[in-house]
Regions:
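N-terminal glycine/threonine-rich, aromatic-flanked beta-hairpin/loop signature
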Residues: 53-101
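Edge beta-strand at a domain terminus
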Residues: 84-95, 130-150
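C-terminal motif of bacterial Sec signal peptides marking the signal peptidase cleavage site
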Residues: 14-17
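Bacterial signal peptide processing site
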Residues: 19-22
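Ser/Thr- and Asn-enriched, surface-exposed coil loops between beta-strands
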Residues: 94-96, 121-127
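N-terminal helix-cap/turn-to-beta initiation motif at the start of protein domains
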Residues: 27-44
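An anionic, turn-rich surface loop/hairpin at beta-sheet edges
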Residues: 96-119
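Sec-dependent signal peptide recognition
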Residues: 2-8
């Protein structure tokens, strides 16, 4: 038993020192109503189609409630650690069959998002998006206090 506790302590310290502890809520965490107020804030993409992002890859969203805009900081399409910053607007609607839908566009005539997403789950600290046109395409976000790449 002592060895197990020591091993768990070592793993925890290693994970914290690597900055990869991902806070997840219990499955019975209360669901929130999907609205601009409840999704506003800073979020980190932690899972893409059920898999964690590769080491060094990041996507952060800063969602603003008042004017329904967002800023995305990401390096998924970059060979450097310099964030690619994208801005735009988002829109929320409700589909009778699918539920809450989020869609958006990019500023500077860069077009619309590739998908519209069902916000399948929203708690105080987690949000799960599933593409309306491909239910196997999912993105899991966790709320963060600070976006470290701003």
């Amino acid at each position: 038993m002592k060895k197990i506790l020591i091993l768990l302590s070592i793993i925890t310290v290693a994970a914290v020192s690597c900055g990869k502890i991902i806070q997840t809520e219990p499955e019975d965490a209360p669901q929130l109503e999907v609205n601009a107020n409840n999704i506003s804030g800073q979020w980190e993409l932690v899972e893409w189609n059920g898999s964690y992002l590769s080491e060094g890859t990041y996507v952060y969203l800063d969602i603003v409630r008042n004017d329904k805009t967002y800023t995305m900081y990401q390096n998924m399409d970059s060979f450097t650690n310099v964030p690619h910053v994208l801005t735009g607007s988002y829109y929320l609607s409700t589909d009778v069959e699918l539920g809450a839908i989020i869609r958006g566009n990019y500023d500077h005539d860069s077009g619309e998002w590739s998908h519209r997403y069902i916000i399948q789950s929203l708690t105080a600290n987690e949000m799960l998006w599933v593409a309306t046109d491909d239910f196997s395409f999912s993105q899991k976000f966790v709320r963060v206090d600070v976006i470290p790449v701003k």
